[in-house]
Every structure is written in structure tokens, then in C-alpha cells.
UniProtKB/Swiss-Prot annotation:
EC number(s) recorded for this UniProt protein: 3.4.19.12
GO cellular component terms given for this protein: cytoskeleton; cytosol; nucleoplasm; nucleus; sperm flagellum
Compositional bias of kind Basic and acidic residues: 601-612
Region Disordered, annotated ranges: 601-636, 753-772
Encoding gene per record: USP26
Illness: Spermatogenic failure, X-linked, 6: A male infertility disorder due to asthenoteratozoospermia and characterized by reduced progressive sperm motility and morphologic sperm abnormalities, such as thin heads and short or coiled flagella.
Organism per entry: Homo sapiens
Subunit architecture: Interacts with RING1.
Name of the protein in its database record: Ubiquitin carboxyl-terminal hydrolase 26
Highest taxon in the source lineage: Eukaryota
MF terms in GO: cysteine-type deubiquitinase activity; deubiquitinase activity; K48-linked deubiquitinase activity
KW Iron-sulfur (keyword) present: no
InterPro entries associated with the record: Papain-like_cys_pep_sf, Peptidase_C19, Peptidase_C19_UCH, USP37-like_PH, USP37-like_PH_sf, USP_CS, USP_dom
Pfam families recorded: UCH, UCH_N
């Protein structure tokens, strides 16, 4: 018994209602002895069944324009079917099938090269009608009249998804087979039990009529045996049918059971079994129904900020992979933990069932609200604030999980080195997806302009918050220019701990680059009433973000991706996503209102505090990590490395900073007589650095009230370190005697129009311009350029030495830039639509690595968009930007292409079977 499965556009004609509109449908032609039928599955969720045996009046096939075919089927009751849009092969196969049925010449049609057996299932609704209604029409027994009235069969009474029951397709089939055996052994006993449960009156009538059923037992047994074989075949081939009213997933119970089994095996065990050979076959079915895949997220009430952020996060393959690529048993994680909430949403975010999405989003919102009460109600909130809380809470979640299942070192010591390698089974740790993907490390150098004391502070951040230019410019700024301005040197009102001088110079640089660089534009400013207002100025969205100019020799590249052998099967996740597109009723436990979900498992938070600053390398070998740690760094240049606070101090950033000090210290002169404001007897060679003790205690640095807010320091660390062994390189000690201090430098507020200038403007009045240097990395303020140009004059002999030092420094910086080019590629944008800060709507534009196109996510609405159009439309509304390191981006594309090739090979293999 075979089935023909094809696709076309169908119109149904009726003498009473007329002809319906043309609708796309999947057509299933089922051939059985005297029970041939045609089943139409529509996109709307409905399906229609037409009996063909002894019911066909006429079949006409017409072809026109070469490849367009039109089939007209007329039934005995003058109803008709008009089918078009069929290929020539499909049209001929369907015509042969209908003619054979019309002529009562039953020969199973063969469709070469097609996987028809995969879709040879019939609906349980039809099985119920056949097995429990029509079989007993010949019998005078009224045993199944109740089943006929309710349309519910014995098979439907079997429990489906419960918290304690998880059955695979094979297990369900085995249970059904056992029930059939009991039914065949004693049909009357089965009828008695069934009727006792439903209606005692009918049970008495059935008991009186049992004697009349004996003669039909043999025939019934044969028919039931035939139905059982067909049922087993259907279960083995597709496992996708149910009678829940869902259009194509008719027998959703089997789908539910198999789906939950897969999810439980995937989530609740350390590894999943590879015994599920039917997953690829199930994948084929869902590819026939792409309309059942819904990528949008429902709005729970002013939760567009949450939907936009979640769409951006979950569209990043490396983050999704790291979220699921954990070695600890998922069954031990509380269901209301944020890690589990994100994992479940990652599985079911594409399901067609909106109620499931609402439930998952509500649980996730409760998990966030347990730590941040601002998100508890239905008020409008800021997307960046939600992103910050989400990443921080997820990181804290993983730190406490690492504390619970703390990896043991091979030496049995608690202070095992924090950099744990996944290829060491005894020292494997649980990588945090936030640390491996978003966490970046900045080195903030603050130098006193009076005594030259330098304070080095390491800052760990998950994103960079960047100010927009406050002055209106003729040409719009870009993400690149505002990003470069953030890393430019600037003057700070910072009180020196040594000499109590109030003016310092601060410079930022990268110590470690992230895989994903999140750039947050501060789209707010003060109005005339000193109140915050939204800043909707136009900003050009850069497709590529270059960060090499803000790196140095000690800058570490992003953490490497997991090796192919260690990556969790991301294709499996896609299959499960498609499988869950049906009406799956999964009951999740209520979220527990607690500010610390994992608190009962932890005795003290001291260990988690010690784990701050861990770098866990997941899935990379020792050789790769040594290459990672040693790349672009030399032992002689590395002064010290502190793993506890991630301080990575090199000569390069210090020299960079001191070069800037040498320039700016000579460019300002005293107002009276042009004499220096400070004594020239303070050499740079006496610069002191704060040292870091071996076991530093964390102390919070407190600024005095006289200082302005330093908004550049997003998350300053609690530690200030002293290291008396660190000194300025010798090449700068010669300049120390010529250094003059000043405190009259002005802070330039105006930002560059485009990327920061790479050279000084050509002076028109100075005679000696050949010695004027072009430093590419020293972002000097515009207000100081005129005084800097005075250094080109030979009237001051010390200027030549200073310029020579600056020139040598610029050449060295240029050579360092040539060693490696770090570029980031735009992959997602979160935008705020609205005129005020307290109202509006959030949307998300994200790059789909599987389809390699951009999509706009507006809650439940998902639309494709061109990247250039997106960049143009989001100039005034772009708020949060996600950039992926270009090497990681290319690697992701290669992996996706390989996965698609493997998937295509699997499909071709399955179709040949």
C-alpha cells in the first residue's frame, strides 16, 4: 500500500456553494483496497478528505504553455476538484492513479526518486473512523457507537506528554501493538472494558449482543491486523500524525513524545545518543511546511525591548553554541535559572505555538526580574539596561555553577590556574558564553601631568558605551569616528595620590578583544532645562569597524571557537526547532521568586569572587592556547601579568601615554611672559608606578567631589596597583630634563567629522615643516594644534629632540599595526523608534547565518531587508550595535556552508531509500 504525495493549487467546486478560491495545498493520494481517498492539507490549518472508491465520475488532464498542467476531477455527487500548478511528472502520476482507481485496477503507483514512504502516513482521525466505525458497520454490535459519536479512538486515550512519561515513536508503537494483541485475543473483553469506562447502559446492550459478534471475529481480526501493520509503518516512517486539529501534524502525540525525548536527552544528560536515526526524516517533513516556522516573539506588554535584545543574542551562532555546549548535567540546573530559560527559549523560539513562546518569555522575564526589580511590571524599559542585566546575571549564574561543580585540579589544589583547557579531562571547566563571546578587556592608563605617576587600571566590560558628538556638524559622524574618539587621549580632573595634582591624562587601549563587540550609543543629551532628552542625530552605520589602531603588541585576540569535534550538533537544534513548530503543550514549572536562584547550593560567595577574571578556554587544545597567549607578544617586553584582575601591563601603552605627555607638556606656556608654569626640574625619569602586591586586597578608589565625572570608565575595577619595578623605557628618560608641566590644557569638545585625522594639517606659516611628524595614533586635541606647530621652529633646540622621539614612536606604532589587522563586521542592530526616552518602540535587525540575509524583527513580524537599506534607515534610530570579529565571521560562514552540504547529502540519501 503506497501513497502519492505532491504539491499544487486546489479549487473545490460544489453545486451549492460554488467554486472556492485557489489555495496552495499538499495532496496525498492514498490507495487502499476499496478505500482509496484523496487528502488535501491547506496552509490555513485545515484539511479535507475525498473518498475516491466508486466515487469518480471523470478525470481530465490538460497541459498548456509547456510546463503548466491543469487536472479536473469530477465526483459522483457533482463535486469537483480543480488542481493546477503541478509539474508534468506529478500531473501524470496523479492522472494514472485516478484512472486506475476509476477503472478498479489497483496497482501501487511508483514515484521514482521521491521519498514517498516518508509521507505515507494517514491521519489518526481517518484511522479512527476506519478502525472503529467502518469495520463494525457489518456487525450488529453497537460496541463502538460511542467512539463513533465522539470521534475518539482507543489509541487517543493513551497519555501523551506528562512530566513522568517520555516515549519514543518505537515505544508508542510497541505499546499499541501490545494493546492490539489483547484486543485480538478477546474482542468482547476489550469492548466490555471500553464501554464500562464510557457508558454503563451501552455496556449492558453490548453484552446482550456479544453472541452475535462471534461470526465476525475472524474477519475483524484480519482487518485489525492489517490496520496494525499500517499503523506501525506510519509510525516508523514519519511519527508526525495526530488528531488534535492541527493541520499537518495530525498525530501530534507521537511528535510531542519524540520531541520531548530528544530535548530531554539533549538537555538533561551529558551527551545525547546517536540512536535517533529518524531525525533527518522528520526534518524533511518540516521543510515541506516552512509556514509553520515562526521566528517572531510575542509582546507580553511593553516588552519590545526584551524581544529585540533576545533576537540579537540568539541570532549569534557562537553564543547559542556556547550556551548549549556544556559538560555539566542540565538536569541539576534549576528550571528557573536564567541559563535554563535561555536554553529553552533557544530551542522553542521558532515554534508556531504562540502560547509556548509567551510562557517561555514570561519565565525568562521573571528570572531577570528576580535580580532586577525594574523589569518586574509591564512598564517600558531601556533595551541597553535589559541587555546589561541579562549578560551580568548570566555571567553570575555561570560563576556560581562553576562554584557548585568546581573542577578539581590534578594536584588537588583549590588555586588551580584559572585558565582551564577543555582537552584536559581532569581540569575541564564550564565556559561562560558571556565571557567567551562578549567580554572585552581595556587597559586604562591615567598619568599625572605634574609628577608623571601612572595608574594602570584593567576594566572588564561586556560592551562599550560611547558618547555622541554634542555639537552639530556639517557632515554626520559615523560609528567608526565616535569609536575612535572614545579611545583618544583626554584630560581628566583626577587627583594624584602622590602629589595631589588635579590634572591627568587618560588613554584607553585593548588588552583583550572579544568575539562580539557591542557598541552602545548614548542617544541622550541635556536640554535647556538640564533634563535628559533623546539625541536622534544622524550617525553613519559602519559595516566594518577597525580597531587595530587601539591595540598594541600585548593585545590578545578573541577566544578561538570550539573545535569541530567539540561543537554540539547545531543542526540538531535546527531540527528540534522545526519539530516544535506544532501545537506542543509543554508545562514548565513556575518561576521561583528569588534574587539568588542558586543560593541554596552555595555556602559562600568567596569562591565566586576568586573566580572573577577567569578565562576558560572551551574546546581548544593546549597548543592553540599557547599560540593564543603568545601571539604578538615578546617575553622581554612583557613586564607583568596579573591573572586575578587581568592586568596586562606592557611597555607599549606606557610609552604611548608618555609620548603624549611629552607633546602636551611643552605645548602650553605660562600666560605671563611665556615661561613655564611649573619647575623644569621634575624629570620623567622619576616617574613612579603603583605596584601590585602578590596577594592584592581589593580596595575601592574614591574620587573627591571636585572631580568631574569620568564617563569613559564604564566599570572601573576596585583595585589600584603599585609596582615600583616598572619604569619608563630608556629612550624617554633623555627627554625628562626637557619636560615642562602645565595645567592650562583645554579639553576639546568637538569630535572629528569622520575618522580621526591621520596626520597634522600642513602649516602655512612655519618654515621648517619637514621635521613635523605625522603620528597616526596620538589623538591630539584640536585646540592644541596651533601650539604644537610651534615645535617645528628651530628657536627652541629642545623641540627637535622631542619631535625626533615622537617620530620614532609613530614609526614603531605603524610597524605594530602592520602585524595584525583586527576588523569587526556588523551582524545586528537594535533600534529605538520614538521621539522621547520614556516612550517608543524597539526593533531588531539581525544577520541570519543560515540564509545569509538580513531580517527585521518587530515582535511577531519578521521581514527580510537589504543590508544597505537597513544601514540607511537606522541612521537616526540605531541604539545598540553588535559587531563580530571578521575572522570569526568568516569561520561561521564556512561552518554553515559545510553544514548545509552535509544536510543536503543526508536528504539525498534518505530520498534514495
Amino acid at each position: 500500500m503506497a501513497a502519492l504525495f505532491l504539491r499544487g493549487f486546489v479549487q473545490i467546486g460544489n453545486c451549492k456553494t460554488g467554486i472556492s478560491k485557489s489555495k496552495e495545498a499538499f495532496i496525498e493520494a492514498v490507495e487502499r483496497k476499496k478505500k482509496d481517498r484523496l487528502v488535501l492539507y491547506f496552509k490555513s490549518g485545515k484539511y479535507s478528505t475525498f473518498r475516491l472508491s466508486d466515487n469518480i465520475q471523470n478525470v481530465v488532464l490538460k497541459s498548456y504553455r509547456g510546463n503548466q498542467n491543469h487536472l479536473h476531477l469530477t465526483l459522483q455527487n457533482n463535486n469537483g476538484l480543480f488542481i493546477e500548478g503541478l509539474s508534468s511528472t506529478d500531473a501524470e502520476q496523479l492522472k494514472i492513479f485516478l484512472d486506475r482507481v476509476h477503472q478498479n485496477e489497483v496497482q501501487p503507483p511508483v514515484r521514482p526518486g521521491k521519498g514517498g514512504s516518508v509521507f505515507s502516513s494517514t491521519t489518526q482521525k481517518e484511522i479512527n473512523k476506519t478502525s472503529f466505525h467502518k469495520v463494525d458497520e457489518k456487525s450488529s454490535s453497537k460496541s463502538f457507537e460511542i467512539a463513533k459519536g465522539s470521534g475518539t479512538g482507543v489509541l487517543q486515550r493513551m497519555p501523551l506528554l506528562t512530566s513522568k512519561l517520555t516515549l519514543t515513536c518505537g515505544e508508542l508503537s510497541e505499546n499499541q501493538h501490545k494493546k492490539r494483541k489483547r484486543m485480538l485475543s478477546s474482542s468482547s473483553e476489550m469492548n466490555e472494558e471500553f464501554l464500562k469506562e464510557n457508558n454503563s447502559v451501552e455496556y449492558k446492550k453490548s453484552k446482550a449482543d456479544c453472541s452475535r459478534c462471534v461470526s465476525y471475529n475472524r474477519e475483524k481480526q484480519l482487518k485489525l491486523k492489517e490496520l496494525e501493520e499500517n499503523k506501525k509503518l506510519e509510525c516508523e516512517s514519519s511519527c508526525i500524525m495526530n488528531a488534535t486539529g492541527n493541520p499537518y501534524l495530525d498525530d501530534i502525540g507521537l511528535l510531542q513524545a519524540l520531541t520531548e525525548k530528544m530535548v530531554l536527552v539533549f538537555l538533561l544528560q551529558q551527551g545525547y545518543s546517536d540512536g535517533y536515526t529518524k531525525w533527518d526524516k522528520l526534518k524533511l517533513f518540516f521543510e515541506l511546511f516552512p509556514e509553520k516556522i515562526c521566528h517572531g516573539l510575542p509582546n507580553l506588554g511593553n516588552t519590545c525591548y526584551m524581544n529585540a535584545v533576545l533576537q540579537s543574542l540568539l541570532s549569534i551562532p557562537s553564543f547559542a553554541d556556547d550556551l548549549l555546549n556544556q559538560s555539566f548535567p542540565w538536569g541539576k540546573i534549576p528550571l528557573n535559572a536564567l541559563t535554563m530559560c535561555l536554553a529553552r527559549l533557544l530551542f522553542f523560539k521558532d515554534t508556531y505555538n504562540i502560547e509556548i513562546k509567551e510562557m517561555l518569555l514570561l519565565n525568562l522575564k521573571k528570572a531577570i526580574s528576580a535580580a532586577a526589580e525594574i523589569f518586574h511590571g509591564n512598564a517600558q524599559n531601556d533595551a541597553h539596561e535589559f541587555l546589561a542585566h541579562c549578560l551580568d546575571q548570566l555571567k553570575d549564574n555561570m560563576e556560581k555553577l562553576n562554584t557548585i561543580w568546581k573542577p578539581k585540579s590534578e594536584f588537588g589544589e583549590d588555586n588551580f590556574p584559572k585558565q582551564v583547557f577543555a582537552d584536559d579531562p581532569d581540569t575541564s571547566g564550564f565556559s561562560c558564553p558571556v565571557i567567551t563571546n562578549f567580554e572585552l578587556e581595556l587597559l586604562h592608563s591615567i598619568a599625572c601631568k605634574a609628577c608623571g605617576q601612572v595608574i594602570l587600571k584593567t576594566e572588564l566590560n561586556n560592551y562599550l558605551s560611547i558618547n555622541l558628538p554634542q555639537r552639530i556638524k556639517a557632515h554626520p559622524s559615523s560609528i567608526q569616528s565616535t569609536f575612535d574618539l572614545f579611545f583618544g587621549a583626554e584630560e581628566l580632573e583626577y587627583k594624584c595620590a602622590k602629589c595631589e595634582h588635579k590634572t591627568s591624562v587618560g588613554v584607553h587601549s585593548f588588552s583583550r578583544l572579544p568575539r562580539i563587540l557591542i557598541v552602545h550609543l548614548k542617544r541622550y543629551s541635556l536640554n535647556e532645562f538640564c533634563a535628559l532628552k533623546k539625541n536622534d542625530q544622524e550617525v553613519i552605520i559602519s559595516k566594518y569597524l577597525k580597531v587595530s589602531s587601539h591595540c598594541n603588541e600585548g593585545t590578545r585576540p578573541p577566544l578561538p571557537l570550539s573545535e569541530d569535534g567539540e561543537i554540539t550538533d547545531f543542526q540538531l537544534l535546527k531540527v528540534i526547532r522545526k519539530m516544535t513548530s506544532g501545537n506542543i503543550s509543554v508545562s514548565w514549572p513556575a518561576t521561583k521568586e528569588s534574587k539568588d536562584i542558586l543560593a541554596p547550593h552555595i555556602g559562600s560567595d568567596k569562591e565566586s569572587e576568586q573566580k572573577k577574571g577567569q578565562t576558560v578556554f572551551k574546546g581548544a587544545s593546549r597548543r592553540q592556547q599557547q599560540k593564543y597567549l603568545g601571539k604578538n607578544s615578546k617575553p622581554n617586553e612583557l613586564e607583568s601579568v596579573y591573572s586575578g584582575d587581568r592586568a596586562f601591563i606592557e611597555k607599549e601603552p606606557l610609552a604611548h601615554l608618555m609620548t603624549y605627555l611629552e607633546d602636551t607638556s611643552l605645548c602650553q606656556f605660562h600666560k605671563a611672559g611665556g615661561k613655564p608654569a611649573s619647575s623644569p626640574g621634575t624629570p620623567l625619569s622619576k616617574v613612579d608606578f603603583q605596584t601590585v602586591p602578590e596577594n592584592p586586597k581589593r580596595k575601592k578608589y574614591v574620587k573627591t567631589s571636585k572631580f568631574v565625572a569620568f564617563d569613559r570608565i564604564i566599570n572601573p575595577t576596585k583595585d589600584l596597583y603599585e609596582d615600583k619595578n616598572i619604569r619608563i623605557p630608556e629612550r624617554f628618560q633623555k627627554v625628562s630634563e626637557q619636560t615642562q608641566q602645565c595645567d592650562g590644557m583645554r579639553i576639546c569638545e568637538q569630535a572629528p567629522q569622520q575618522a580621526l585625522p591621520q596626520s597634522f594639517p600642513k602649516p602655512g606659516t612655519q618654515g621648517h615643516t619637514k621635521n613635523l611628524l605625522r603620528p597616526t595614533k596620538l589623538n591630539l586635541q584640536k585646540s592644541n594644534r596651533n601650539s604644537l606647530l610651534a615645535l617645528g621652529s628651530n628657536k627652541n633646540p629642545r623641540n627637535k629632540d622631542i619631535l625626533d622621539k615622537i617620530k620614532s614612536k609613530a614609526k614603531e606604532t605603524k610597524r605594530n599595526d602592520d602585524k595584525g589587522d583586527h576588523t569587526y563586521r556588523l551582524i545586528s542592530v537594535v533600534s529605538h523608534l520614538g521621539k522621547t526616552l520614556k516612550s517608543g518602540h524597539y526593533i531588531c535587525d539581525a544577520y541570519d547565518f543560515e540564509k545569509q540575509i538580513w531580517f527585521t524583527y518587530d515582535d511577531m513580524r519578521v521581514l527580510g531587508i537589504q543590508e544597505a537599506q537597513m544601514q540607511e534607515d537606522r541612521r537616526c534610530t540605531g541604539y545598540i550595535f553588535f559587531y563580530m570579529h571578521n575572522e570569526i565571521f568568516e569561520e561561521m560562514l564556512k561552518r554553515e556552508e559545510n553544514a548545509q552540504l552535509n544536510s543536503k547529502e543526508v536528504e539525498e540519501t534518505l530520498q534514495k531509500e
